[in-house]
Amino acid sequence: MLASRMPDAVSLTWGLPSFQTPEYIRNGIIRVLQQDKDAGKYTLPDGLPDLRQQVVETHLNRTGIEVNADANVMIAAGNMQGLNTLFHTMMDPGDEVILTDPCFASHIQQIQLFNGEPVYWPLNDDWSLDIERLPELVTDKTQAVVIVSPSNPTGKIFSEAELRCVGEIARQNDFFVIIDDPYSDFVYDNNSSYFNLASVGELADHLIYLYSFSKSYAMSGWRLSYMILPEELKYEAMKVHDATMICAPRISQLAGLIALTEPSDHKQRFRTVLSDRRDLICQRLDTCSHVFDYRKPDGAYYLFPRIRTPHHNAKTFAIDLLQNSAVAVTPGSAFGPSGEHHVRMAFCVDEATINSAFDRIEAYFSNRC
């Protein structure tokens, strides 16, 4: 909010890619608007049948797991709305959801909105999962654990072995693993490092998978995602979804159907650009080693550097940086207790923005030395 009142500020805060929705989707939706007389109407609460059936095929291609369009697929207005529906469905006051620490800040807020308790699961120093710690956090009030891989805010990709352990602990203790997946199409260096726990069929009764169109298709403003979930849970979640949302916007669902069915190489192009931006921001951070140290992210488009220079806390550091160099970063404390003394930087912005931000950061801290 402070940055919005500074018109000359350079922002590395918002995880909003600089890409435009691909042309084939834009042109396709123009055709639909001209030809489909129902394009402005409601759909069924769980989404267009054609889109849900295409999700079945897409999920099979991505995971090797076959699901049922009517029993297991639900279309949401973005992963955040999908998660909001899930938490509303599964939580009573005082119930607990385990979050990696650091985690996506909105997950904390959503759980608290329903008078639930976020239970923080601190990551190891290299941002990997501390599997031995997880069983100690499970209680009779545990409803779920939320996993984002590649991670927001760290960019870490959790290993197959780690994720399988999480799934087994959830199965043994009868709670859900919720996979929030906005970033799996943005994996750098080693594509084989990414593992989707939704590909483990024996976990189907304890697993909820949410895939967002926002990042991979540059459709953040369209508000669209899909959920794969057990039939009984879908039945209950539909009651909440219908009462609060009715349905995801039909026009967005039609765009999603185009996105999934027509061939395009845009994901590879996006990934190449983001990989170059990751390299650039890491190079610029290397020149600021007296201010930050960091781990190079495996995926997504965030870094989570630790603040080395003297400071009180992450929030005051971020405010000071904004007020004195007109560069906006997100305080790490927003992402959980372990985020303190870190900041999040998004490298989904263009190269000129990255360079401008670090020119200012370097100038500010050189003047302080």
Regions found by a protein language model. Name each.
Residues 1-77, 85, 259-262, 368-369:
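N-terminal small-domain helix-loop-helix segment of the aminotransferase-like
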Residues 89-111:
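Conserved PLP-anchoring active-site segment centered on the Schiff-base-forming lysine
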Residues 125-192:
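Active-site phosphate-binding strand-loop segment of PLP-dependent enzymes
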Residues 199-236, 248-251:
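Active-site PLP attachment segment
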Residues 237-241, 260-282:
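Structural signature of PLP-dependent enzymes
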Residues 257, 273-282, 294-307:
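Conserved glycine-rich beta-strand-loop-beta hairpin in the small C-terminal domain of fold type I
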Residues 313, 320-329, 335-369:
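PLP-dependent enzyme catalytic core of the Aspartate aminotransferase-like
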